[in-house]
Curated annotation (Swiss-Prot):
It is found in: Virion. The lineage of its organism: Viruses, Duplodnaviria, Heunggongvirae, Uroviricota, Caudoviricetes. Signal peptide: none annotated. Homotrimer. Forms a pseudo-hexameric ring. Interacts with collar protein p132, DTP-pb9 and tail tube protein pb6. Keywords: Late protein, Viral tail protein, Virion. GO terms for cellular component: virus tail. It holds the Pfam family Baseplate_Tube_p140. It comes from Escherichia phage T5 (Enterobacteria phage T5). This is Baseplate tube protein p140. It comes from the Viruses.
Length: 298
């Protein structure tokens, strides 16, 4: 019998002494690599074809997780780890970045034969999800400074995912008025960081790993796709003109995203049915973008 390693894998995140077990995975991807220093020691008398090469560092690892939303709402922790401010089940993207360094955690990818890869010094770089005609999936991008293969791992998990949430139809509102003919709504939240280059003399003859990073900026955006319709002649919103300082609420039965003041640019796609896409970002004077999860957080 053959086993798919990906199908049998588990993801466990260690943070603040607790273990978060994500088993409602739709997909994941991870890769590791090393940096090489190589030079040819050529002189006018000797032209060797064999390079002098050493492995001197680990490249930062990129990990992407596609996670189903579940009844325990532990998926919302990725927004905490990204640096959002939490008040109950509400999360706010701060106007000014509160942290110089991103929140760090460690992560295991555990296979069915108990072999696992341990990623250290991890931070969340992106969190994306879409509300459309399918079950919502959270796409999480993670950067890690160090990886290693280990034979032991956390066997007990403090928090695990619950049942996968069923489909719920999305809707978009502006000034309490629904916008018709919605096709899909995609949200993207990013934390852009850079690794600190802190090598010293004690790292000579060692494989260097990244340990610390610093936050450059955080941002939020959304893309809304509609069929191009007009409710009334001279409609002031359902047109192709850009909008600014417009409040928007994107929601379904389980989650809502609020842009208190948004700038909207519109793109018309010509096909059998005209479609218009709204590119949404918060304005500079907007209150914090808010994400609300409806339900009991475990």
């Amino acid at each position: 019998m053959f086993y798919s390693l990906m199908r049998e894998s588990k993801i466990v995140i260690e943070y603040d002494g607790r273990g978060y077990h994500f088993d409602a995975l739709s997909n994941y991807d991870a890769s590791t690599s090393f940096q090489e220093f190589k030079t040819l020691r050529r002189t006018i008398h000797n032209r060797t074809n064999y390079a002098d090469s050493i492995i001197n560092a680990q490249d930062p690892s990129s990990i992407s997780l596609a996670i189903n939303f579940s009844t325990t709402l532990i998926e919302s922790n990725f927004f905490d780890w990204m640096g959002f401010t939490r008040e109950g089940n509400s999360l706010f993207l701060p106007r000014n970045t509160p942290n110089i360094e991103p929140i760090m955690f460690n992560m295991y990818i555990i296979n069915h034969n108990n072999s696992c890869i341990y990623f250290e010094n991890c931070y969340v770089s992106t969190v994306d999800f879409s509300l459309d005609k399918s079950i919502p999936i959270l796409n999480v991008g993670i950067e890690s400074g160090k990886f290693s293969e280990v034979s032991t791992f956390r066997d007990g998990y403090t928090i695990t995912q619950g049942e996968v949430l069923p489909y719920s139809a999305p809707a978009v509102y502006t000034n309490s008025s629904p916008l018709p003919a919605l096709i899909s709504a995609s949200m993207s939240f990013q934390q852009q960081c850079s690794w600190r280059e802190d090598r010293n003399i004690f790292d000579i003859n060692k494989i260097y790993t990244n340990k610390r990073a610093y936050v450059n900026e955080m941002n939020a955006s959304a893309t809304l796709a509609f069929y191009y319709v007009k409710r009334l002649v001279g409609d002031k919103f359902l047109n192709l003109d850009p909008e600014t300082r417009t409040p928007l609420i994107i929601k379904n039965k389980y989650v809502s995203i609020t842009f208190p003041l948004a700038r909207i640019s519109k793109r018309l796609n010509f096909s059998d049915l005209y479609q218009v896409e709204y590119d949404v970002i918060p304005t500079a004077d907007s209150d914090p973008v808010e994400i609300n999860f409806f339900g009991e957080r475990k």
